[in-house]
């Protein structure tokens, strides 16, 4: 069964691309009876406020017609930012060699949070170098991942 994020990604991807942007990912966060639907968009040269406004208008119109969300919600559209979240294995592949933080659904070695250098993606696994040692994680066990920005 597909998640709400997966359904929204499928529903909205084409419209966002028609506006010249890439739908980088979607997060849905529930707080009581309300939900925040956060769309991350990206494009060559960066995302402007106008890009976010255009995507927000287009997506709002689609969600009003399709009505896939039963709860009250707020729609947010933004760039992925410096601490870019990673949603797909292909996104992980684009950032091999970068430092990332991952949060796991099920702990590995009694830890849910790991930080290290992204080394490789292979057979639905993500390998990080943590304290000089390779650590392999099943992609399906990664709840959240973010790039660690370099300053």
From Swiss-Prot:
Q: Which InterPro entries match?
A: Ribosome_maturation_RimP, RimP_C, RimP_C_sf, RimP_N, RimP_N_sf
Indicate where this protein is primarily found.
cytoplasm
Q: Which GO terms describe its cellular component?
A: cytosol
Keyword flag Cytoplasm:
yes
Q: Does the keyword Cytoplasm apply?
A: yes
The alphabetized UniProt keywords are:
Cytoplasm, Ribosome biogenesis
Kindly list the biological process annotations in GO that this record carries: ribosomal small subunit assembly; translation
Look up the domain of life of the source.
Bacteria
One Pfam family name is DUF150_C
List localization entries: Cytoplasm
State the HAMAP family in the record: RimP
In the record, the note on similarity to other proteins reads:
Belongs to the RimP family.
What does this protein's UniProt record list under function?
Required for maturation of 30S ribosomal subunits.
NCBIfam families the record matches: PRK00092.1-1 (NF000927)
Stated name of the protein = Ribosome maturation factor RimP
Q: What species was this sequence derived from?
A: Actinobacillus succinogenes (strain ATCC 55618 / DSM 22257 / CCUG 43843 / 130Z)
């Amino acid at each position: 069964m597909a998640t709400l994020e997966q359904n929204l990604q499928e529903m909205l991807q084409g419209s966002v691309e028609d506006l010249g942007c890439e739908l980088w990912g979607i997060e849905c966060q529930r707080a009581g009876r309300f939900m925040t639907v956060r769309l991350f968009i990206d494009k060559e040269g960066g995302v402007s406020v106008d890009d976010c406004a255009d995507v927000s208008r287009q997506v709002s119109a689609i969600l009003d017609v399709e009505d896939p969300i039963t709860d009250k919600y707020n729609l947010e559209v933004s760039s992925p930012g410096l601490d870019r979240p990673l949603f797909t294995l292909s996104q992980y592949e684009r950032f091999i060699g970068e430092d990332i933080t991952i949060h796991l659904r099920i702990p590995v070695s009694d830890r849910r949070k790991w930080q290290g250098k992204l080394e490789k993606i292979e057979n639905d696994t993500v390998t990080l170098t943590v304290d000089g040692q390779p650590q392999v994680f099943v992609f399906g066990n990664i709840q959240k991942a973010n790039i660690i920005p370099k300053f």
